[in-house]
């Protein structure tokens, strides 16, 4: 019994460690709410070129993000999608707070082509424009830090379809 207990504790620690690593890859910078971070990552494309636009995100995360999608719409329009019927999130079947856009939007998908772990300013990206539907996860706003005009806000771009 003791070896099994010891082995299971090691497995549990390994699993928790892996979850911590995965969680840290999706972590937001502390100074932002989830809605603010969503807007930075998926709405505010600061340049027409992915390589330049991704520098903003990469500087916050201190790493080259593998891929990212910028929706060419407004934050208010995405907030309106939060009012569409709830659905199960495709990327996490235990979450039921996803909503699909009712129409396609122009978007730009950025894909890392030149990793640069030593200097994130040198990360290079290819970009693919498209018109697609999207699915977002929405939650109640952060009462202390998000503006009160939107009680429910997008917090995660779950899928583009």
UniProtKB/Swiss-Prot annotation:
Substrate binds at residues 65-69. Its main location: other. The modification 3'-nitrotyrosine is found at residue 60. The keyword Heme does not apply. Pfam families: RnaseA (PF00074). PANTHER family: NON-SECRETORY RIBONUCLEASE, RIBONUCLEASE. This is Non-secretory ribonuclease. It comes from Nomascus leucogenys (Northern white-cheeked gibbon). The gene is RNASE2.
């Amino acid at each position: 019994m003791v070896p099994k207990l010891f082995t299971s504790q090691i497995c549990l620690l390994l699993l928790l460690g892996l979850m911590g690593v995965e969680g840290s890859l999706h972590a937001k910078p502390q100074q932002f709410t989830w809605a603010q971070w969503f807007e930075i990552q998926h709405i505010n494309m600061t340049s027409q070129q992915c390589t330049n636009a991704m520098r903003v995100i990469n500087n916050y995360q201190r790493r080259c993000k593998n891929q990212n999608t910028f929706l060419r719409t407004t934050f208010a329009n995405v907030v309106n999608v939060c009012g569409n019927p709830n659905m199960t999130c495709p990327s996490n079947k235990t979450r039921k707070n996803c909503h699909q856009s009712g129409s396609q939007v122009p978007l730009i998908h950025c894909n890392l082509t030149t990793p640069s772990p030593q200097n994130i300013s040198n990360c290079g990206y290819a970009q693919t424009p498209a018109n697609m539907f999207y699915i977002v996860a929405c939650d109640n706003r952060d009462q202390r830090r998000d503006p009160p005009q939107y009680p429910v806000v997008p917090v995660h771009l779950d899928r583009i379809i």
